[in-house]
């Protein structure tokens, strides 16, 4: 046996073990609390998955808007959705549709086009011939067999400040803009008739020109029409909002919406901030979970405030369309302007650069949010009711569980390991296991 002597580690080992041990302990604690916070909101909405639907109804569907953050790709936004938002939607067994934008302006163009399609279906005149897509084919097939949507309010989940600004811009463009695309500006490079009259060629030059035109014709046939490289240009500018009349199909209150935090910062010099956020994801999970649970339960809505009055007394059930606030009550300090505004400080510097070649080009991410009082008054936000907030607190304390169910008894660690890696079975599996009698007849029975 070798002779091992117990002694304290050296100074360098003490520093290494202290740093790595502290970081590991902070990471393990944060992930444990993050999982507990997410489980609290999942248990709050899990009773919705137990509710049965008639065979001729489809599940309530939410619309999720997400786009690539400035300076990064779409994968980061997808991971944020899957990590913080999707678990709560899955716990409630809700259907959702994701609208993604890889570049600036795609969310705005996509939302505006959806609203224009709705207005055309409502009977507003338009010269645009719509192409039949997959969604229209599925909707027609469901209508023929008598399948309808669940009669509950819908909602929009908007992830990130840049997506929120495009969402606001798309709402105004869709409801206040024209249904037909505007005429493209006339090019200034067209030669004048006088210039064409001055160039008079001799008769001998005519055959040569005809031969050259014949040679160019095959080359033109091979050319394919170029596809648009960016999102559809806006049909209306923010300066024209006030001059447009409201369409007949505009409802008294729009579908409720919920903006979701998406903190994202890049850069080597911002490493301390990134480490701090990496070790404090439990706070983000709790905040995002509260917002997502509010739109999933859809029990209470409130209008977006303008800073001139309190919104605590204006909570209304989500199934009732609240009357929009009058235009003269809405000041200039809209709540929609400042939501998630702190995220703009973390954007990459390339997002704030202006296009020198086209300085007048609209930038949805950089330009300030412009709101029309008629649209802003119809916007609603889903919030948790005081009853749901109190129930979530009881769930976190362990005094309550999923609505209508009792909290299961905790299973010891050794038993979980035996069930997972050994030959044991949990009680629920044993209950479902069929009891088979003596089918071989060994006991002469």
Swiss-Prot record:
The listed locations are: Mitochondrion inner membrane
- The organism's superkingdom is given as Eukaryota
Give the start-end ranges of region Disordered: 175-252
Q: How does it sit in the membrane?
A: Single-pass membrane protein
Q: Where is the composition biased (Basic and acidic residues)?
A: 211-226
A GO BP term here is: protein transport
* Keyword terms of this UniProt record: Membrane, Mitochondrion, Mitochondrion inner membrane, Protein transport, Translocation, Transmembrane, Transmembrane helix, Transport
InterPro entries reported in the protein's UniProt record: Lipid_Phosphate_FormReg (IPR050187), Mt_import_IM_translocase_Tim54 (IPR021056)
Residues on the membrane's Mitochondrial matrix side span 1-11
Entry keyword Zinc: no
Asked if Manganese is a keyword of the record, the answer is no
Gene Ontology CC terms: mitochondrial inner membrane
Q: Where is the composition biased (Polar residues)?
A: 197-209
**Any stretches that span the bilayer, and where are they?**
12-29
Where do Low complexity bias regions lie? 242-252
Query: Topology: which residues are Mitochondrial intermembrane?
Result: 30-445
Q: Which family does it belong to?
A: Belongs to the TIM54 family.
Function, as annotated:
Essential component of the TIM22 complex, a complex that mediates the import and insertion of multi-pass transmembrane proteins into the mitochondrial inner membrane. The TIM22 complex forms a twin-pore translocase that uses the membrane potential as external driving force.
Assembly and oligomerization: Component of the TIM22 complex, whose core is composed of TIM22 and TIM54, associated with the 70 kDa heterohexamer composed of TIM9 and TIM10 (or TIM8 and TIM13).
Could you identify this protein by its name? Answer: Mitochondrial import inner membrane translocase subunit tim54
Q: Look up and give the organism this protein is from.
A: Aspergillus oryzae (strain ATCC 42149 / RIB 40) (Yellow koji mold)
Q: Gene encoding it?
A: tim54
